[in-house]
Structure formats: structure tokens, C-alpha cells
């Protein structure tokens, strides 16, 4: 469901990027120093970091599958309130994993496409399914009836994605670009409330995208500290600033206010915090630079 959108609040990512950055992949998200390729003959060994990231995503998708199977049972049992409460929590695993999960476009369409994006691409609502199809029924029709077949299909589609992920080669470029793409997700859809248009549970997705980007940063942290300790300190501060803001909107240790309950001042503060985080995050590409001789 992540169609090309006007990249709100991320122009700064272009300004801090290096002129030697490669052209953006896929749907035209921010081109930054994070996407610079490493010369084959002078490549920094990041094999442990890439292996650890793949393991992290595989664990997230395992959790997604298990939780979605339980969600499907709630829907079949007609437990509307429980299903509504579980829905945004389940989705967080997918949102954290998007740098890899979204690279399989066919699976992303089946699992996570919004109605607006599906209709724009296919000119019809017929065939639309996945999390957001179920979301629409739960919140617009206020029932679990009609969700059962979509739930079964969703479980099968996640199983298919799980199998695909085992085949992917994770590169430093995928991780670096993925961290920026996760912030673009926040800037283009979470900030505007477009992601969870029926349930208004966008803050869960917002947090998960930030967590996904932060995981990439944490995996690179040891080597990044050797390159630029000041950059690491800045990233720590900016991640904390975003997370502290999100904490203000939590109603308990897991759940968040509806996005529609936030004021314009609230969303402005979140947008500014994401923009400030994007500046140093886009500089993580220095980790791929060989040490000076």
C-alpha cells in the first residue's frame, strides 16, 4: 500500500544527501547518502550486521504469522472488540519489517495495500484484501461478519511472504535505504492519517516504523561509533525525542490514542521531530566508507 506520494516533510533528506547518491529504487523515496553503494574492492565487512538484520525480520514475520492466526480465530469467533484491540498491535511487526517485506511487491499488495492505492492501481475494489480490507469491515460495518475469508487469505499470504524472505540477500544498502524509507512512511502516510483511515490507529504504525529504523541504527551502532561518535550521540537524542513524543499518546503500556484525538499542534510536533531525526539518519552511509589509509 505504499504508493508514490508527495514526500511531505522529507525535503531535508535531499538537502543533506550526497550528490553521488544513486537513483532511488522502486517508488521514488528519498535519495540520500544512506543509499550509496560501496566499491567492491574496498568494501567494509558488514556481513554480521546484514545477517542479524535478516534474522530480526524473520523473527518479526514469525510473530506476525502467529498473531495473525490468532486474529483470524477471533474474527471467526465473532469477537469484535477483541479483534479491534488486537488489530493495530499485530500490524506493528509488518511495519517494522517493511524494508524487506515491501520489497516483495506482490505480497505487499495482498497483505498491506490501502483501498485508495488499490483502486488507483487496479481501477476497481474487486480483489482488494489484506489487513486494510478487514479494517474497513471491522470499523465501518462494526462486525466480524465477512472478514473470515479475508483472514484465511491473509494467513496464507503471510506464510508465502515468510517463505520468500528466506531467499532474500540483505545488503548494507538495503538496510541504510530502508531506514530512510521507514521515515518516509511516517512522513507520507502516518503523519497525514492516511494509513489507518478507518480505525485511526496510525500511531501504532508510526511507532513501529520508528522502531524499525532504530533497529537498523542499533545494528550499525558499534561500527558507526568508530566512524563518528558525535553522529551516534545525535541519533540517540533524536530517536529519544520522537519516542518521548509518542509516549505522551499512550493509554497504557501497549495502546495509543486514536490519531483523530491529536491536535494540529501534536501532529506538527511529531512531524518536526521526524524531520530532525531524518537529517542525521541519512548520514549513516558513512559506515560503508573504508578507513583512511
Residue spans of the language-model regions?
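Positively charged n-region of N-terminal signal peptides that target proteins for export
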Residues: 1-4
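Bacterial lipoprotein signal-peptidase II cleavage site
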Residues: 6, 16-34
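Residue-level signal for mature regions of secreted extracellular proteins and peptides
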Residues: 11-12
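Hydrophobic alpha-helical segments and their boundary regions
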Residues: 6-8, 67
